[in-house]
Amino acid sequence: MKKIEFTLALVAAICFCRATSISAWEDDRFRFHFRTVNFPGDTFTQLLGINDSGTIAGYHGAAVNKGFAFTFPNDFDLENFPNSAQTQVIGINNRGYTDGFYIDNAGTNHGFLDINGTFTTVDFPGTTLNQLLGLNNLEQAAGYYADAAGIDHPYIFDHNGGVFLVITIPAAVGGAQATGINDNGSISGFYIDSKGTNHGFVIAKGRFQTLDFPGSTLTQAFGLNNHDEVVGQYVDASGLTHGFIFDDGRFTSVDDPEGVGTTTINGINDRRQIVGFFVTAGGNTNGFVGSE
């Protein structure tokens, strides 16, 4: 199995970033209508990826994770790696192929691809913890492995040939994860610096750009579409969590109206539909879909 490694130098990115806090929610660029999606009979559902047909990858169960693919109005197609103890389905492409990770009966995390109903384990050679977090239409998956010291290392796995592309970020002293890849080869993710601070990033057209939502204490990018619109979460100075969209050099804050201050956006498709989850006042985790 081939391994390719390259090093990206950090580039100081100059952008004029506009931060907007919106609840019900619109600005001059976006207007979303939110729908809550919960797995029947469960109080914990996360929606993590969405393709252009509106099929959604996710999982339910706080204690024991079980994966699914969801289509409206209420069709949950259960998807779990065979004989696994737990499964999270995270990325989905326009063919309906998915990726994610599963935990085996020994408690080990493995990445996986589900290509037309055929499951394949994806583990970086010599490692014991892998997760795949995003998948494009070329069957390239974004993910990471953890080394023996517990430090995460981001990579891209190309299913066509089984090639791993390792991404080395000099500032990522505390580790990094690749969370999404689009058909143009742009990559989203986040890294942890020497002070333990989380920063989002996007690699587009060979340029590495750090993403820090203005005034935040933590920023993590979780996905992107073919327009290089990036989504994720940030934590504000009060410790509240909000979703964001980064587009054309500008940030916009996004909260599901039912989960203001507890919202995470994990996926976005080319129709600018977003998926994620929020936590209710009662402690339940609800999935959501936002459409313009």
Walk through the language-model features, giving the residues of each.
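C-terminal segment of classical bacterial N-terminal signal peptides
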Residues: 14-21
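Residue-level hotspots at or immediately adjacent to binding/recognition sites across diverse folds
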Residues: 22-292
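Bacterial N-terminal signal peptides that target proteins for export
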Residues: 1-8
